[in-house]
Amino acid sequence: MEPCLEIRSLSAVLPNGQRVLRSVSLTVQPGEVRALVGESGAGKTMIGKAVLGVLPKSVRIVEGEMLIEGESLGRLDAKARRTLIGARTALIPQDPLTALNPSRRIGPQTTDRLVRILGWSGEKADERIRQLLQEVQIREPERVLKCYPHELSGGMRQRVLIAAAFAAEPRLIVADEPTTALDVTVQKQILRLIAQLQRNHGTALLFVTHDLGVVAKISQKVSVLYAGKVVEEAATADLFASPQHPYTRALIAATPRYTDPYASLMPVNETVLAGLADEIAGADRAWRPSHG
């Protein structure tokens, strides 16, 4: 069976030549949840944007290949690439408070993609969105579809965005830190909801996060990113049981422990900005935290 997503030696640079992604390779199998974890600036979101074809104009891919179900995105013209990405992938964005257009009702915003990209009738798209809103535990879907975003809470807006992502039965969903902007109680509900829908629909999930607690709850495989490079890759249970790279060990050690409320957080020291890693020979291998 073809991987849902395969990235082969992908590198990307800024206009000044600094590399933001360095020979990134990973695969996501059908129905698999793979987490991308690392601190801010590690390149997690950049990988997700590359897959979805929405890299900033200032970022240029200089080598490597991305394949969705065996089809190479780089070998397609722009229109065919947009069609493939639109039909087989979807995004759950980071901030539900800014992801929706404040001047449009929820209904048209969530059905647009189904009508324009997939060619569904308006009636079919409306029915599908109503069904998904019920799946994400929104009790009054008809009322919500008529609402403007400001009339809904942050948690409700994120549920709407999750419903929209799953509506077209994509093969792959990129979840870009989808709980970061929510309070802790709502975060748990949203994580549980994403995991449930992922299992029910059999959708592959590329889950971008800096939170190892989230990684432990939702993923089967993990890719650890440091300075734009995958420095460790493992099954989730194996990664926590026996982390191999010093950066991975430092991330795990820096996770807050609640056994001692007065304990200080362990810093992750001596980090390297992704763009500077090329200038420091062996930065991804030589990095060491000050503890452990």
Spans of features found by a protein language model:
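Short catalytic/signature loops enriched in Gly
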Residues: 3, 139, 143, 235-292
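Conserved ABC transporter NBD signature motif
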Residues: 60-72
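Conserved ABC ATPase signature
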Residues: 147-152, 156
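A short, proline-enriched helix->beta-strand linker immediately N-terminal to the Walker B motif
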Residues: 167-171
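A short, surface-exposed alpha-helical micro-motif characterized by mixed small hydrophobic
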Residues: 215-217
